[in-house]
Amino acid sequence: MSKRIAGPEIERLIQLLARVPGLGPRSARRAALHLIKKKEALLVPLGGAMQEAAEKVRICSCCGNVDTSDPCTICTDERRDPTTLIVVEDVSDLWALERAGTMNVRYHVLGGRLSPLDGIGPDDLNIKGLVERVSTGEIKEVILAVNATVEGQTTAHYITDQLSSFDVRVTRLAHGVPVGGELDYLDEGTLAAALRARTTL
């Protein structure tokens, strides 16, 4: 049995930090110590921000994004193209696409991807909400921005089937050579996808 080296409040802080993705027990201890050392500058404001987020952040009932308003800021932005919808697996994917800043459109967050091995089926994802949005007739193109994994591709095929009866163009992100990537370092699947998604110059 390991010895307790700190009070229960500090141990609880470490245990909770260790639950954050990307932080293991050791990283959580380091983060906790850093927060405690910078109590007034970091720990107190962080605690307040987390409390405020817990009280005010909600899931958008339209697209599944997280925001302090429902519908979210993206869904209510009239400058965005309402006829194009990008479908993503998770909010982090939505944020990544927004950082890229290449398209001023609306989104739909699935909340995961189909994975029969993990017991995740269509009813566990926000696919029904997507079909309802497309059924209004306002959306002309659905861009499937799912990950290039077996589960991601399975999800893309399922969604394509679900939307086949609607007058909507379904596309997906091209997969292939990343900017700055060298061919010698790419796997065969990535190279094959890049060749299939080649474009005319």
Curated annotation (Swiss-Prot):
Superkingdom of the source species: Bacteria
Biological process per Gene Ontology, one example term: DNA recombination
Domain spans labelled Toprim: 83-178
Classification via InterPro entries: DNA_Rcmb_RecR (IPR000093), Rcmb_RecR (IPR023627), Rcmb_RecR_Znf (IPR015967), TOPRIM_dom (IPR006171), TOPRIM_RecR (IPR034137)
Pfam families: RecR_C, RecR_HhH, RecR_ZnF, Toprim_4
Zinc finger region(s), C4-type: 60-75
UniProt-recorded Gene Ontology molecular function terms: DNA binding; zinc ion binding
UniProtKB keywords: DNA damage, DNA recombination, DNA repair, Metal-binding, Zinc, Zinc-finger
Transmembrane segments: none
Signal peptide start-end: none
Protein family (similarity comment): Belongs to the RecR family.
Role played: May play a role in DNA repair. It seems to be involved in an RecBC-independent recombinational process of DNA repair. It may act with RecF and RecO.
Official protein name in the record: Recombination protein RecR
Organismal lineage: Bacteria, Pseudomonadati, Pseudomonadota, Alphaproteobacteria, Hyphomicrobiales
Gene designation per UniProt: recR
